[in-house]
């Protein structure tokens, strides 16, 4: 039996096989087969060929080539002076929705500030409610400023829309001013939540995961907590009516 192979490396080895002296010739080659040749008589010649690659394989498994990826047009850095350099995957619809939400937050803050001024009057003198609505106004203004900062982070343009002038009188002959004001606050918080959910839907529609995360983490949780808290205040004011219980409720707000 004989099988040839190329690039043969041969060496000899003497051993005793079956009592006869034999000379084995081992050969290592670069082919992909194993062969042996056996001569008649007491002499045996063996040729062994081990598999090896003809050429080194090219490097594989590269999954990211940055300089090739950077050739994509949408990754080019703008050179126009009035164009944001940081803007990426931020739609015009999302930009407009953020500007609208800024306006919502400022409007609600303005109403709360008017409520603060009303309850701080000397002839109303419900200092706890005044404190509550002043803090609520500041909180809504902080929300607006947070949205402004986010708009700039994403490369959008902040556009401030007009703010509606709120009422200055909150008397209600049946409910009383405290309950009426708190019910108004509850409605405003629910309206704000509805507007925030709209911004979140805009983010989903435009596959803007970063905007969705921002609204979820910074606003939505806090919003439902505010709704729950004010809903409890409404319930308590309904229980106490318009009498002395309002003063006790006000004192609790003042010292919270």
UniProtKB/Swiss-Prot annotation:
Protein location: Plastid, Chloroplast
Key word Oxidoreductase present: yes
Domain Ferritin-like diiron, chain residue ranges per copy: 88-241
Residue segments, region Extension peptide (EP): 55-87
Keyword DNA damage: no
GO molecular function: ferric iron binding; ferrous iron binding; ferroxidase activity
Organelle targeting sequence: 1-54
Residue numbers binding Fe cation 2: 140, 189, 223
GO cellular component: chloroplast
UniProt KW keywords: Chloroplast, Iron, Iron storage, Metal-binding, Oxidoreductase, Plastid, Transit peptide
Catalytic activity: 4 Fe(2+) + O2 + 4 H(+) = 4 Fe(3+) + 2 H2O
InterPro entries listed in its UniProt record: Ferritin, Ferritin-like, Ferritin-like_diiron, Ferritin-like_SF, Ferritin_CS, Ferritin_DPS_dom
Quaternary context: Oligomer of 24 subunits. There are two types of subunits: L (light) chain and H (heavy) chain. The major chain can be light or heavy, depending on the species and tissue type. The functional molecule forms a roughly spherical shell with a diameter of 12 nm and contains a central cavity into which the insoluble mineral iron core is deposited.
Protein name: Ferritin-3, chloroplastic
Species: Vigna unguiculata (Cowpea)
């Amino acid at each position: 039996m004989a099988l040839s192979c190329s690039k043969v490396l041969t060496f000899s080895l003497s051993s005793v096989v079956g009592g006869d002296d034999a000379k084995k010739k081992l050969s290592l080659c670069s082919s992909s087969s194993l062969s042996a040749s056996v001569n008649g008589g007491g002499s045996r010649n063996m040729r062994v060929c081990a598999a090896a690659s003809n050429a080194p394989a090219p490097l594989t498994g590269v999954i990211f080539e940055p300089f090739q990826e950077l050739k994509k047009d949408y990754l080019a850095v703008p050179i126009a002076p009035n164009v944001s350099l940081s803007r990426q995957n931020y739609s015009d619809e999302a930009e407009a929705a953020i500007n609208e939400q800024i306006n919502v937050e400022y409007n609600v803050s303005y109403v709360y500030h008017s409520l603060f001024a009303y309850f701080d009057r000397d002839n109303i003198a419900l200092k706890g409610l005044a404190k509550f609505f002043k803090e609520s106004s500041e909180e809504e203004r902080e929300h607006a400023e947070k949205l402004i900062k986010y708009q700039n982070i994403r490369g959008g343009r902040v556009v401030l829309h007009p703010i509606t002038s709120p009422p200055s009188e909150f008397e209600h002959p049946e409910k009383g001013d405290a309950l009426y004001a708190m019910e108004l606050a509850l409605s405003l918080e629910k309206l704000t939540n509805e507007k925030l959910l709209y911004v979140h839907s805009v983010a989903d529609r435009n596959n803007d995961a970063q905007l969705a995360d921002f609204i979820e983490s910074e606003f939505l949780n806090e919003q439902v907590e505010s709704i729950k808290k004010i809903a409890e205040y409404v319930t308590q004011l309904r229980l106490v009516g318009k009498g002395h219980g309002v003063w006790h409720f006000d004192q609790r707000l003042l010292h919270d």
